[in-house]
Swiss-Prot record:
Gene3D superfamilies: Multidrug resistance protein D (1.20.1720.10). Keywords: Cell inner membrane, Cell membrane, Membrane, Transmembrane, Transmembrane helix, Transport. The chain crosses the membrane at residues 7-27, 42-62, 72-92, 95-115, 135-155, 160-180, 209-229, 238-258, 271-291, 299-319, 341-361, 362-382. This is Purine nucleoside transporter. It comes from Escherichia coli (strain K12). It catalyses: adenosine(in) = adenosine(out); 2'-deoxyadenosine(in) = 2'-deoxyadenosine(out); guanosine(in) = guanosine(out); inosine(in) = inosine(out). GO terms for cellular component: plasma membrane.
Length: 403
C-alpha cells in the first residue's frame, strides 16, 4: 500500500527545511550585526559555516540512516536542529552565533538526506520519478520565498522570531516521525557494506550525479554573478530582486511539466532532449554577453529556459542515481548532495575570483558554459553503462560488495 498525500506533504516539508534554515535569516544580517555589535564579516561567516556543515554532515547521516533506520536518525537530526534554533533566541555574541549555526547545519542536513531515501523506500520504482518531480519544484521555490518570510518576521517582530519560527516548523515535522511505519520492501543485506567509493564505481551513479551537480553549478554561477551584472547594467536593487521571480516560476514549470510528461514517457527518454535544451539555453546566455548594450530581457529569456530544463532534469537524474541502490539510498543521497554542493561552491568561487578580471557578464556566463561539458560527460558515463558497459559496471559493484 502506497503512502497518502499527508506523507507527501511531510516529505515536501523535510525537503525545504534546509533551504529555510539557509535563507530565512539573510534579510536579518544587518539587524543581527547591530544587536550583537559584531563586524559584518562575522555574520557573513555564519552562512559560510552553515553551508560547510550542511555539506559535510550529510556524509555522516546517510550511512547512519542505512544502518540504523530512517526513523531514529531523522529524529536525532531534527532534534539537534530544533535545539540549535531554540538556542538562537538567547545569542549574545558572534561566537555563540557561529557555534549554533553550525549545530543547526549538522542537524538539518539529516532531513536533506533522508527525505530522498524515504521516497525510494516507500514508493514503487516506477513512481519514484514522479514523486521527485512533485517535490523538487518546491525545493527550487523555497530559496525565493524564504527571504520574503524572513523579511516579514523581521519587520513585525525581531530577528530572533525567524529562528523561533524555524523551531516551530521543526517541531511540526518531528511529530509524524513517531507514526512512521517500517518499509515493506525486502531487505537486501548485500548493500550494507557499500562504501562511497563503491558508489562512485557505478557509471550510472556518477554520471547522473555529475549531471545534477553541473546543472546546479550553472545556476549557482548565475546567482553569484548576477548582482554584479545587473548593477553594472544600471538596475536598482529592487529590480535585481524581482529578476529572480521569473527564474523561480520557470523552474516550477520545468518540474511540474516533467511530472506530467513522466505519465507518458520514461525519464531516460526525456533526459537527452532536456540536456540538449539545457546546453542550447546556456550557450544562448553566454552568446548574449557579446551583444552590445544587452538588456535584462535578452539575458533572462535564455536563462529562464535553462531554469525550465533544470526543473525537469533534477527529478530524473536524482531518481536514476538512487535507483540502483535501494538499500543504500542514505549513503547514495548523502554523497550526491555533498558532490552537488561542492561543485556549486567551486563554480561560485571561480566567478567571485574572476569577476574583477573580466566583465561580470562574460565571466559568469563562461563559467556556466563550462558546465555544459560536464553535463555531456555525465550523460556519456551513464549512457555507456546503459547500452554497452552495464554488465561490466554491475560486475564491479558486485565485486566490491563481496568484499
Amino acid at each position: 500500500m502506497q503512502p497518502g498525500k499527508r506523507f507527501l506533504v511531510w516529505l515536501a516539508g523535510l525537503s525545504v527545511l534546509g533551504f529555510l534554515a539557509t535563507d530565512m535569516y539573510l534579510p536579518a544580517f544587518a539587524a543581527i550585526q547591530a544587536d550583537l555589535q559584531t563586524p559584518a564579516s562575522a555574520v557573513s561567516a555564519s552562512l559560510s559555516l552553515f553551508l560547510a556543515g550542511f555539506a559535510a554532515a550529510q556524509l555522516l547521516w546517510g550511512p547512519l540512516s542505512d544502518r540504523y533506520g530512517r526513523k531514529p536518525v531523522l529524529l536525532i537530526g531534527l532534534t539537534i536542529f530544533a535545539l540549535g534554533s531554540l538556542g538562537m533566541l538567547w545569542v549574545e555574541n558572534a561566537a555563540t552565533l557561529l557555534v549554533l549555526r553550525f549545530v543547526q547545519a549538522v542537524g538539518v542536513c539529516a532531513a536533506a538526506v533522508i527525505w530522498q531515501a524515504l521516497v525510494t523506500d516507500y514508493y514503487p520504482s516506477q513512481k519514484v520519478n514522479r514523486i521527485f518531480a512533485a517535490i523538487m519544484p518546491l525545493v527550487g521555490l523555497s530559496p525565493a520565498l524564504a527571504p520574503l518570510l524572513g523579511s516579514w518576521l523581521l519587520v513585525h517582530f525581531s530577528w530572533q522570531a525567524i529562528f523561533a519560527t524555524l523551531f516551530a516548523i521543526t517541531v511540526v515535522l518531528i511529530l509524524p516521525i513517531f507514526w512512521l511505519k517500517p518499509t515493506t520492501k525486502a531487505r537486501n543485506n548485500s548493500q550494507d557494506g557499500l562504501t562511497f567509493t563503491d558508489l562512485l564505481r557505478s557509471k550510472t551513479y556518477r554520471g547522473n550525479v555529475l549531471i545534477y551537480a553541473a546543472c546546479s553549478a550553472s545556476f549557482f554561477a548565475w546567482l553569484t554573478g548576477s548582482p554584479f551584472i545587473l548593477s553594472e547594467m544600471g538596475y536598482s536593487p529592487a529590480v535585481i530582486g524581482l529578476s529572480y521571480v521569473p527564474q523561480t516560476i520557470a523552474f516550477l514549470i520545468g518540474g511540474y511539466g516533467c511530472r506530467a510528461a513522466l505519465q507518458k514517457w520514461q525519464g531516460k527518454q526525456l533526459l537527452p532532449w532536456l540536456l540538449v535544451l539545457f546546453a542550447v539555453s546556456v550557450i544562448a546566455t553566454w552568446a548574449a554577453g557579446f551583444i552590445s548594450h544587452v538588456s535584462l530581457v535578452e539575458i533572462l529569456i535564455p536563462f529562464c529556459v535553462m531554469a525550465i530544463a533544470n526543473g525537469a532534469i533534477y527529478p530524473i537524474v536524482v531518481a536514476q542515481a538512487l535507483r540502483p541502490f535501494p538499500h543504500a539510498t542514505g549513503r547514495a543521497a548523502a554523497l550526491q548532495n555533498t558532490l552537488q554542493l561542492g561543485l556549486c561552491f567551486l563554480a561560485s568561487l571561480v566567478v567571485s575570483w574572476l569577476i574583477s578580471i573580466s566583465t561580470p557578464l562574460l565571466t559568469t556566463t563562461s563559467v556556466m558554459l563550462s558546465t555544459v561539458v560536464l553535463v555531456a560527460l555525465g550523460y556519456m558515463m551513464q549512457r555507456c553503462e546503459e547500452v554497452g558497459c552495464q554488465n561490466h559496471g554491475n560486475a564491479e559493484v558486485a565485486h566490491s560488495e563481496s568484499h
